[in-house]
Amino acid sequence: MTSTLRVAFAGTPEFAQIALAAIHQAGFPVVAVLSQPDRPAGRGMQLQASPVTQYAVTHGFAPILQPPSLRRTGKYPQEAAEAIDALTAQRPDVMVVAAYGLILPQEVLDLPRFGCINIHASLLPRWRGAAPIHRAIEAGDAESGITLMQMDAGLDTGDMIAMERVPIGLTDTTGTLHDTLAALGGRMVVEALAKLAQDGKLHATPQPAEGITYAEKIAKDEAALDWSRHAAALLRQVHAFNPFPGASAALDGVAIKFWQAEVLADRPAEAEPGVVLAANAEGVTIACGAGALRVTQLQKPGGKRLPAREFLQGLAIQPGQRFASRG
C-alpha cells in the first residue's frame, strides 16, 4: 500500500528497528528518523550506530537525527533545538515511538498533527517503564503483550489505542519474548497507521487506575543469584536475564553465567543453598532454599555459552563445591 500519511519515527534498539521496518515495508513515507547517538560497543569499543540508525542509513531515510537530548533547556540546548527544528521542517502527521530512550518534551509531543504513538511491550498499566519484558518474566507473569498508546508527558501513562496479549511460555526468555513482541508491535502499529490514514483519527481509552506497576531498568548486579530463594524464582531470573545481563554466581572466585536451567523439586534436606549436588552431562545441579536448580547451559569469563557436558570438560565442578550467594 502507499499512503500520504507522513510518519516520523523515534527509536533505538532492535525492538524499534523491527517496527520501523514494518512501517517502511507497509508503504508509509518515513519523513524523519530519530535515534540515540552512536555509542562505543564491542571489545574494541568502536562507535556503533543503533539498529534504527543502521536501518535508516541503509534505506536512505533523511533526515536522521541523533541528538543527545531533546530538551531546549537541558545540557545540550543547541543539539536539541537543531533536531526539533529539523523535525518541524518535515511536517510529520504522526510520530511512532518505540524504545527511543530519550524523554520527549511537550513541544515534541505536540509537533505532529496526530501526536505521538508509543509501542510499549507490556499490558499497561502493568510494567510501565524501561524493562517491561524482563520484569514480566522475572515476576512469573502468565502473559505479556503490546500496548499502543497515545503519548502524554507522563511515564507510559497515555491513553490506550490497542492492546494484544501473548502467553509467556515456561521456557521463554527475555530474548524469545522480545522477538515475539517486536514482531507483534510492528504489525499492530501498521494497522493503527492504516486506520489513522483512512479515518483521520484513532480511538483511545484511558488506562485503568488499578494494577499499575513499574519496570525499573535492569542493573547488572541484579543478575547475581541468591541461593536461599526458591528454585522456581531463580529459574525466572535465569530466563529474565537472558540475553542481558546473564544470571550469574561465583564458584571459587570464578563468575559463571547461567543461560538455561530447569527446576528439580527434590533435594537432600541437609544440603545448604548454593551447594553443588551433581555435575554431569545432564547439568550442574545446585541446592536452593527450596528445590534445586539444574543448569544446562553455562559460560565462564571469556568463553562461549556451552551445554553442561562441554562446559565441564573445560572447568571441572565437583559435588560439594559451593556457589557464592548474592547479598
Curated annotation (Swiss-Prot):
Its EC number is 2.1.2.9. The keyword Protein biosynthesis applies. Keywords: Protein biosynthesis, Transferase. SUPFAM superfamilies: FMT C-terminal domain-like, Formyltransferase. It is an enzyme of class 2 (transferase). It catalyses: L-methionyl-tRNA(fMet) + (6R)-10-formyltetrahydrofolate = N-formyl-L-methionyl-tRNA(fMet) + (6S)-5,6,7,8-tetrahydrofolate + H(+). GO terms for molecular function: methionyl-tRNA formyltransferase activity. One of its GO terms (cellular component) is cytosol. (6S)-5,6,7,8-tetrahydrofolate binds at S122, L123, L124, P125. Pfam families: Formyl_trans_C, Formyl_trans_N. Attaches a formyl group to the free amino group of methionyl-tRNA(fMet). The formyl group appears to play a dual role in the initiator identity of N-formylmethionyl-tRNA by promoting its recognition by IF2 and preventing the misappropriation of this tRNA by the elongation apparatus. Belongs to the Fmt family. This is Methionyl-tRNA formyltransferase.
